[in-house]
Amino acid sequence: MPLTIRKANINDLLKTFEWANEKEVIKNSIERSKKIEINEHSTWFKKYITLKFSSLFIVSLRSEKIGLVRIDYKKKEFFLSYLVDRKKRNKGYGYQMLNKIIKKFKNKKKVFKARVKRSNLASNSIFIKLGFKIKYTNQDKNTFLYRLET
């Protein structure tokens, strides 16, 4: 069954809040190390979905929301981050959703980048499978920066 991708809207606020507070999401996050409160998430989410140089996409399988892909645009670079619902992990959906997003924007001659913790083996594997190359390693933050030119 093919995945569908659409821009996030206000109706996705609670689901994205739930995902943001999942144990594995927090563990693999570069930006934070603890749960967030609904007020903080709500403020961020409402602002984020209106930003000109960022996009948040909800990924669904049939009518079930199974993950999201976030893109931050800087010049001609697309910085990617994503998550998959804990019930849908290890089934290939992370690869499928990122591949679909990359294909959606491929004709725009962009550079895709992603920062991933070394310990996040699943995401490291997915970005390599998608053709990303390691641009550099940040020893302090224990992360890789991946890059893909289209």
Which residues does each predicted region cover?
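A short, well-structured alpha-helix characteristic of acyl/acetyltransferase catalytic modules
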Residues: 1-32
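Conserved GNAT acetyl-CoA-binding A-motif
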Residues: 106-117
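Conserved active-site alpha-helix within GNAT-family acetyltransferase domains
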Residues: 95, 118-136
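Acetyl-CoA-dependent GNAT
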Residues: 34-87, 138
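Conserved acetyl-CoA pyrophosphate-binding loop and the N-cap/start of the following alpha-helix
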Residues: 88, 92-101
